[in-house]
Structures are given as structure tokens and as C-alpha cells.
Swiss-Prot record:
PANTHER family: MITOCHONDRIAL DICARBOXYLATE CARRIER-RELATED. The chain crosses the membrane at residues 6-26, 77-97, 123-143, 182-202, 223-243, 280-300. Its main location: mitochondrion. One of its GO terms (molecular function) is oxidative phosphorylation uncoupler activity. It is found in: Mitochondrion inner membrane. InterPro entries: Mit_carrier (IPR002067), Mito_Metabolite_Transporter (IPR050391), Mitochondrial_sb/sol_carrier (IPR018108), Mt_carrier_dom_sf (IPR023395). It comes from Arabidopsis thaliana. It comes from the Eukaryota. It is a multi-pass membrane protein. PUMPS are mitochondrial transporter proteins that create proton leaks across the inner mitochondrial membrane, thus uncoupling oxidative phosphorylation. This leads to a decrease in the efficiency of oxidative phosphorylation and an increase in heat production. May be involved in protecting plant cells against oxidative stress damage. Recombinant PUMP5, reconstituted into liposomes, transports a wide range of dicarboxylic acids including malate, oxaloacetate and succinate as well as phosphate, sulfate and thiosulfate. This is Mitochondrial uncoupling protein 5. Keywords: Membrane, Mitochondrion, Mitochondrion inner membrane, Repeat, Stress response, Transmembrane, Transmembrane helix, Transport. One of its GO terms (cellular component) is mitochondrial inner membrane.
């Protein structure tokens, strides 16, 4: 297969990532809801002496339409593409690697006689490809999360990254090179879940549709298989994605204890403070983004493969 699979997967991933970036940004904002420290208001009753009562205001939770509307109202239409340069770099590193490796592994593990590959092998191939791709693309992933989340912070706390390269440079200077791999274990776990469920589901659903003669090998089959794969990937990865987003977004200041000690600590604190369903926070925008992302990804991939079919590299 050589570099061909990497090029095909990379082109399709960049197109899909950029076209669904606003939905991904809304998902990140929703996943960070409820994370900030409660607002404290000192209330003094009319007949009180020199005492005060501290009231913790409950965290405001807003739905996907509310988050999107507030984002446009407060930050402008351009804010919907905050961090898109990081998305391009992330797809170039992460998705190009995982798509190319999956193609190579699938070619090696496919039965030469039947031209088929068992579901468990597809899942294994996806997990391996996803893990390696995530390790390569983690710096861009951290930068993307921070750039997408920056607008929700007070003006004095914003990082104001100019681009993905500026974000990476500032992280190295201020927090050390290891900050580029903050949350990498979560990124790898999420990538293994997403890639194995997404690519294996797509291949399996597509094969089933063609075998049963439900549809011909065309746009209808590609869209149907892609939509199913996107939903499966969303269900499998959302809990890890919430924790990953929070760990990557946390601000580390010298001499001050970070909000979370690690992934497990973040998960425990999140569930304790916001309930078990908080792990599926942002699920609607996740599905809303993952389904069209997967559809655009595989439909574009099928077309790119047709363009490259006469070329070998």
C-alpha cells in the first residue's frame, strides 16, 4: 500500500475536520460546563450583624443551541472556527497516521482467499492504528482544545494563542515540552475506541449492505455505513473525551496545585460534583459532529480513492 493510504486518509480527514469544526468547538464548550469553581456571593440579611453567608450558585448548564447562540452573540461568527489551524495540524498528524496504518494492517490481516477480515481483527487493527496516531498528534490535540476553550475564560485569563504554532511554542516556554503530551493516555485510549469502533463499524456495515444486496456500492451505501459508524464511535468514546478535554484544558501555574492530579482524579471529581451522566456531557454535539464527520470522511475517502486508483506510490 505504501504512502497511498496515508495520503488518501489524510486528505479525507482534513476535509472532514474543517467542515465539522464548529460542531466540535460547541462540543468542547459543553464538556467544560460545570467545571469552573462555583460563583460565590456574600449575602447580608437585613437584620444580620457582622456575619456573612456564602451562597454557592449552581453551575449554569446550557444546551447545544444555547451554547452555539451565545458563542456567536458574544464572540462573533469567526469564533466558530477558533482553533481551526490546530484541527488541520491534528488531522494531518493523527488521522493521516491512523487511516494509513489501518489500511496497511487491514491489507496484511485480510484473508487472501476470501478477501474478508473478521470483526475482532478489524477492531484490533483500529486500536493499534488509533493508538499510534494519537501519540503522534497529541500536541495538536492539546493546542486545539485550548484554542477552542479560550473564549469561555475571563479576558484576564485567556491565553490568546495566535495560531496552533504559537500555542505549541507558548506551551513549551511556559509549561515545558511535556505539556504537549498532557492527557496523552486519554487521547490514546479515546483514539483506540474511536478508530476501532469507527473503521470496523464502517467496514462491517458496508460489507453487510453489499452482501445482502440492500444497496449498490455507491453514495447511499457509503453514507449509511458512515452514519452508523459515527454513532457507534460517539457512544464508545464520549466518557473518555470529556475527561480528556478537561485534563488538556486545565491551566497549570508554578507553585499552585493543578485542578486534577491525572485522568482518574479528573473522572472521580467530575462524577462526584456533577453526577455519572456528566461523562456523557456534550453527547448531542458529539453525535452531531461525529456522524457528519464520519460521513464526510468516508464519502471523501471513497472519492479520493477513485482519483488515486491509477497511481501507485
Amino acid at each position: 500500500m505504501g504512502l497511498k493510504g496515508f495520503a488518501e486518509g489524510g486528505i479525507a480527514s482534513i476535509v472532514a475536520g474543517c467542515s465539522t469544526h464548529p460542531l466540535d468547538l460547541i462540543k468542547v464548550r459543553m464538556q467544560l460546563q460545570g467545571e469552573s469553581a462555583p460563583i460565590q456571593t456574600n449575602l447580608r440579611p437585613a437584620l444580620a450583624f457582622q456575619t456573612s453567608t456564602t451562597v454557592n450558585a449552581p453551575p449554569l448548564r446550557v444546551g447545544v443551541i444555547g451554547v452555539g447562540s451565545r458563542l456567536i452573540r458574544e464572540e462573533g461568527m469567526r469564533a466558530l472556527f477558533s482553533g481551526v489551524s490546530a484541527t488541520v495540524l491534528r488531522q494531518t498528524l493523527y488521522s493521516t497516521t491512523r487511516m494509513g496504518l489501518y489500511d496497511i494492517i487491514k491489507g496484511e490481516w485480510t484473508d487472501p482467499e476470501t478477501k474478508t477480515m473478521p470483526l475482532m481483527k478489524k477492531i484490533g487493527a483500529g486500536a493499534i492504528a488509533g493508538a499510534i496516531g494519537a501519540a503522534v498528534g497529541n500536541p495538536a490535540d492539546v493546542a486545539m482544545v485550548r484554542m477552542q476553550a479560550d473564549g469561555r475564560l475571563p479576558l484576564t485569563d485567556r491565553r490568546n494563542y495566535k495560531s496552533v504554532l504559537d500555542a505549541i511554542t507558548q506551551m513549551i516556554r511556559g509549561e515545558g515540552v511535556t505539556s504537549l503530551w498532557r492527557g496523552s493516555s486519554l487521547t490514546i485510549n479515546r483514539a483506540m475506541l474511536v478508530t476501532s469502533s469507527q473503521l470496523a463499524s464502517y467496514d462491517s456495515v458496508k460489507e453487510t449492505i453489499l452482501e445482502k444486496g440492500l444497496l449498490k456500492d455507491g453514495l447511499g451505501t457509503h453514507v449509511s455505513a458512515s452514519f452508523a459508524a459515527g454513532f457507534v464511535a460517539s457512544v464508545a468514546s464520549n466518557p473518555v473525551d470529556v475527561i480528556k478535554t478537561r485534563v488538556m484544558n486545565m491551566k497549570v501555574v508554578a507553585g499552585v496545585a493543578p485542578p486534577y492530579k491525572g485522568a482518574v482524579d479528573c473522572a472521580l471529581k467530575t462524577v462526584k460534583a456533577e453526577g455519572i451522566m456528566s461523562l456523557y456531557k456534550g453527547f448531542i454535539p458529539t453525535v452531531s459532529r461525529q456522524a457528519p464527520f464520519t460521513v464526510v470522511l468516508f464519502v471523501t475517502l471513497e472519492q479520493v480513492k477513485k482519483l488515486f486508483k491509477d497511481y501507485d506510490f
